[in-house]
């Protein structure tokens, strides 16, 4: 049985309160998605950690945005179910849970939009030519413990191992800190632990992904 929940993440160094746009986006998910929405924050995160699979030692040193990147990978592999950025939602998610549950696909999401393609510069020379095979990172539903999520999670842990000592020496101090946007010594680039893992997997397993969910609403959400 597919885990019929949507997980959202609001984690960080100081439990910063959401602004009004974020609160409105979250409220719209609660009302319009027609499934259970779970907001994972610093206070309840521990209750979702699976026995034998603790958060990586380096998690504590990540920027807030990278913590959310890490957690969506962790949750999609170990729990499955839905994920959404905290953005406005005006549709029922149940038909998409049904479609995935009644298929052999690994996941279902929204197709990437060529004009909005979030491909990092290191990916663009080849992956930007194949945007039609990709799903957006903003929202999706995955079955847990598939070959897709296993490769996704394993690659994440590999990068975390590689960067651990640098993270200890230069932990994030800014919510949206990344090596390619702030020159601070923080070692992880903006898309390094999500986009640069997720999109190549979408390309490799495009035939096992359903790309029929509505494209996320990206106006006035921050």
Specify the residue positions occupied by each region the protein language model found.
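Short acidic donor-binding loop at the edge of a beta-strand
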Residues: 79-82
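Glycosyltransferase-associated regions of secretory-pathway enzymes
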Residues: 1-69, 74, 84-222
């Amino acid at each position: 049985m597919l885990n019929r929940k949507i997980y959202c993440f609001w984690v960080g160094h100081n439990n910063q309160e959401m602004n009004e746009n974020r609160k409105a986006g979250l409220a719209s998910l609660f009302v319009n998605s027609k499934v259970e929405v779970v907001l994972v924050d610093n206070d309840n995160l521990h209750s979702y950690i699976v026995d034998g699979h603790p958060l990586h030692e380096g998690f504590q040193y990540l920027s807030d945005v990278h913590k959310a990147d890490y957690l969506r990978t962790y949750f999609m592999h170990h729990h499955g179910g839905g994920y959404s950025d905290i953005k406005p939602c005006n549709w029922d998610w149940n038909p998409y849970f049904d479609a995935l549950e009644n298929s052999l696909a690994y996941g279902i999401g929204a197709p990437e939009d060529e004009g909005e393609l979030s491909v990092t510069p290191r990916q663009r020379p080849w992956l930007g030519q194949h945007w039609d095979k990709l799903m957006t990172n903003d929202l999706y539903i995955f079955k847990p413990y598939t070959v897709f999520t296993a490769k996704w999670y394993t690659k994440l842990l590999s990068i975390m191992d590689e960067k651990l000592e640098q993270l200890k020496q230069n932990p994030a101090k800014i919510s949206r800190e990344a090596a390619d946007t702030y020159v601070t010594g923080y070692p992880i680039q903006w898309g390094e632990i999500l986009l640069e893992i997720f999109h190549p997997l979408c390309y490799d397993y495009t035939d096992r992904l359903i790309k029929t969910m509505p494209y996320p609403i990206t106006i006035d959400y921050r």
